[in-house]
Amino acid sequence: MSKYSNLLFSALLALLTTSCYHEVDLDDFKNNEGKNLLTLNSLICPDSVIAVSATRPYFFSDKHNERTYIKGLNILLSINGQECETLTYNESRHLYLSTIKPKQGDIVKVSTVFNDKLVEAYDTIPYRVSLLDLDVKRRGPLAIYTVRDFVFTYSITFDDPTNETNYYFLQWNEVDAQRDVMMGERDFTHELVFQALANDIHETLPGWKPYCAYGLPFSDRGINGQRHTLVLEETVQADRYSGGWRKPEMKRNFKLYAISKQYYQYLVSVLVNQTDDRGLQGGMIDLGIADPIKIYSNISGGIGIWAGYTISQKTINVFDSVGEIPRQ
């Protein structure tokens, strides 16, 4: 997301990300050369120091007890073209850590040498996009899965920045599993941006529907530069055999991640190539490329993902807006 007066950095970033961004088919790496590749993974945001995982690639078909972490690397961190520091390895976390936090709009680069080969990656941390409004309505009881289901329709409004292409990831969940109504089935299918995502994925995976229990990525195609309201639904089963709805609250936390183009393409590649939700769980990334599938990497000289993001979030108690789910 370009907001820089220094056009040289923007031009350099475009050149570098184009040159090092590539599709990886791990079938090609299942040999000695592949086993000697360095896998770098990191998600970078302004809310924390930079943490980098450095491992060897592994395959689920091979015998392995744990990941093979690579120690002793000199990983140099640069921000906006200025060398900042050499990351420090943390033994207990198996991560290389910085002492500084990057800022929104920073171009962040890491570089190291592994087996006499230069390995490096670049990305830009997007600017935060705020959630402006969050509204909810309830319908039901309806006969969908049981004779007593309730559909909650969420309307989430934000302003998409103008004059640039932007990428996002939307996620929502219960806040407290002990007190909140159990999370129902998410429905992304009525929303324009996820319909556009499905159309893109249909080129590779015909029939795919926009669903994932951990949320989904989307771009601003069709809404560029506009104030847009996302429309999402959640179906909660509330028949006498379902106990998850008998809770005192129904708090829901919504997170809108502004993500880089590299991160978006990585997440889409995971959706296309994995048959379950593993790749999008746990903070939107399954660290370490594993199964021999085609997946995208923006690590020059190695494989993995180096990607920036920011978060905006809002929490509501649904019952405050629409009342409690009626008792039978």
Predicted regions and their residues:
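Hydrophobic helical h-region of N-terminal Sec-dependent signal peptides
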Residues: F9-L13
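A sequence/structural signal for flexible, mid-protein segments enriched
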Residues: Y21-Q328
